[in-house]
């Protein structure tokens, strides 16, 4: 009996390996448009606003701006937090609001201006977060300043800046003065292109009040924004994952307030709501000594959030911004203290990003919502150890592999077109059970524009373990040209990967100037082979490429 069972296992193993040994196929049909390639990826954010105007912060922002053909939106916490502007992990401050001995307001926009000037100089746009509570306005100000250290309990950061104001009218005047100052400094047309938002994750300890107190604060804030600039855009509430009861219920209550309830300021029904925002995070963990990602958790948050917004007929066409959209929830928790975050330096992060963004678009199509943007909550951490494992796009001025996925996205525009593949997981399968089968998700996202087309490919699996490279047979159908120029780009262990180069150097803690130059070069998006001009036969091209596990490729066509 044991021998029979063993034989069955062997047969099943050989059958599964035989299935995987088949070539992966991807077929792109450029005549089948499925939606717009909305640049939802061109949104970024971070906790520490003072990094914005520091050396590596400015360098990275310049690179992000350069990779995008459209203005990039940037969201930062702590824009109204009290302090001297000294940066720290999960902390930042601007001292925008203080009071004199008689309780009169003192406005100082010096640091806020440094932050926004840095964006505007690069053609970027603020997703301007109204928060957090200045010390002089907090209803429970002490203690105020926190000193977060990786490995420390996350709850230690929730201090006096989380609480409602002791005077809502003073708060409203602060918001009014900020928007008015912004218009005076940058011009009405520029500020009309921004998005103003209130707070962050108010269903969590980030907000020390109730849901109704948040709605009250929103009404005061929205009224102040619109008094300063009637054409300004304001939204919220940036709750945590809507698939969870806490986030989902808060989102529903807030949307009901904005569409059906009495406004705390005007006494009328409803409140301005130019966009809806919620957050979505994955959930990596350690399994048998390796990192196992969970993309499904993140996609369920997105799907549920879309569904909740779509359930309000008044919000049918309202833009949706996923205000934080990431593989997990703590950017400042490195892999030394949180080993499940060891995916961040290499190709797991880049392949996850490619595969997950494609599913965000698919879920938006499914729910028929206006998907505007998805903020990648990842930036840089100034003067920290090399490749410490923070969730960042660069380390000490050197780009990580994940940034090159966004460089690829920057070359995709126009309409998304149909992609089918024999190893490509359906979007709902990834949402419901992530990528856990014996075979990887070998998929694609394709676009077509005037005179150009692009196909992004990935070889992704939740398990961060070594695997077989895939041979991918790529069929491109209904190409509207006789001849095309084809260029390929690649992110894997040998291409566009500063982390692997750093490890080959011996993982230096203080690289030399020569090594840094080499790392900077390795951090750029690399071509895969030479560009070539090819004749299209009957509107079709067929060619094969090899894609390593966790590899991401981009094929561009020009005619």
Question: In which residue ranges do the predicted regions lie?
Answer:
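Bacterial Sec-dependent N-terminal signal peptides
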Residues: 1-22
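Short, conserved phosphate-binding/catalytic loop or strand-edge motifs used
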Residues: 194-200, 323
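Conserved radical SAM core fold
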Residues: 51, 80-83, 135, 199-205, ...
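Noncatalytic carbohydrate-binding groove/subsite architecture in carbohydrate-active enzymes
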Residues: 211-371, 380, 384, 425-429
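Active-site rim elements
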Residues: 343-347, 389-397
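Non-catalytic accessory regions flanking glycosidase/transglycosidase catalytic cores in CAZymes
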Residues: 21-195, 212-242, 267, 271-272, ...
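A short small-residue
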Residues: 144-162, 201-202, 278-286, 333-340
């Amino acid at each position: 009996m044991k021998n029979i069972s063993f034989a069955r296992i062997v047969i099943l193993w050989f059958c599964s390996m035989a299935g995987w040994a088949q070539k992966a196929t991807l077929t792109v049909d450029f005549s089948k448009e499925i939606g717009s390639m909305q640049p939802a990826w061109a949104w970024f954010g971070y906790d520490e606003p003072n990094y914005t105007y520091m050396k590596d912060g400015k360098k990275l922002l310049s690179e992000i701006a350069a990779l995008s053909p459209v203005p990039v939106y940037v969201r930062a916490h702590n824009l109204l937090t009290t302090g001297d502007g000294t940066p720290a992990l999960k902390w930042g401050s601007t001292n925008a609001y203080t009071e004199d001995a008689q309780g009169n307001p003192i406005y100082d926009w010096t640091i806020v201006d440094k932050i926004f000037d840095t964006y505007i100089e690069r053609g970027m746009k603020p997703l301007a977060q109204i928060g957090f509570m200045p010390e002089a306005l907090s209803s429970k100000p002490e203690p105020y300043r926190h000193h977060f250290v990786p490995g420390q309990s996350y709850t230690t950061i929730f201090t006096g800046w989380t609480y409602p104001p002791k005077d809502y009218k003073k708060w409203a005047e602060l918001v009014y003065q900020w928007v008015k100052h912004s218009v005076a400094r940058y011009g009405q047309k520029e500020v009309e292109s921004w998005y103003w938002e209130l707070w962050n994750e108010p269903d969590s300890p980030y907000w020390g009040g109730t849901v109704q107190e948040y709605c009250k604060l929103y009404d005061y804030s929205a009224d102040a924004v619109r008094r300063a600039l009637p054409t300004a855009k304001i939204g919220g509430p940036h709750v945590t994952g809507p698939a969870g009861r806490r986030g989902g219920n808060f989102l529903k209550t807030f949307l009901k307030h904005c569409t059906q309830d009495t406004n705390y300021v005007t006494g009328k029904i409803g409140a301005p709501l130019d966009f809806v925002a919620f957050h979505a995070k994955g959930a990596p963990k350690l399994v048998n000594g390796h990192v196992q990602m969970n993309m499904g958790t993140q996609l369920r948050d997105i799907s549920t959030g879309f569904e909740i917004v779509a359930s309000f007929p008044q919000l049918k066409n309202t833009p949706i911004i996923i205000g934080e959209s990431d593989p997990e929830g703590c950017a400042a928790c490195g892999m030394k203290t949180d080993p499940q975050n060891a995916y961040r330096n290499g190709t797991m992060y880049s392949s996850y990003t490619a595969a997950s963004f494609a599913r965000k678009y698919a879920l938006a199509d499914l729910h028929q919502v206006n998907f505007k943007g998805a903020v990648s909550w990842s930036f840089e951490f100034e003067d920290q150890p090399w490749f410490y494992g923070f969730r960042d796009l660069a380390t000490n001025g050197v780009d990580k592999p994940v940034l090159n996925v966004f460089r690829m996205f920057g070359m995709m525009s126009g309409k998304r077109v149909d992609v089918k593949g024999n190893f490509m997981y359906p979007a709902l399968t990834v949402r419901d059970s992530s990528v856990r089968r014996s075979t990887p998700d070998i998929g694609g996202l394709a676009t077509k524009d005037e005179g150009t087309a692009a196909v992004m490919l990935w070889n992704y699996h939740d398990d961060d373990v070594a695997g077989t490279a895939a041979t991918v047979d790529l069929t491109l159908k209904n190409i509207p040209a006789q001849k095309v120029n084809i260029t390929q780009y690649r992110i894997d262990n040998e291409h566009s990967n500063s982390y692997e180069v750093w490890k080959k150097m011996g993982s230096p803690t203080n690289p030399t100037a020569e090594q840094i130059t080499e790392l900077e070069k390795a951090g750029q998006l690399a071509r895969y082979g030479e560009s070539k001009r090819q004749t299209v036969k009957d509107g079709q091209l067929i060619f094969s490429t090899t894609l390593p596990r966790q590899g991401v490729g981009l094929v561009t066509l020009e005619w």
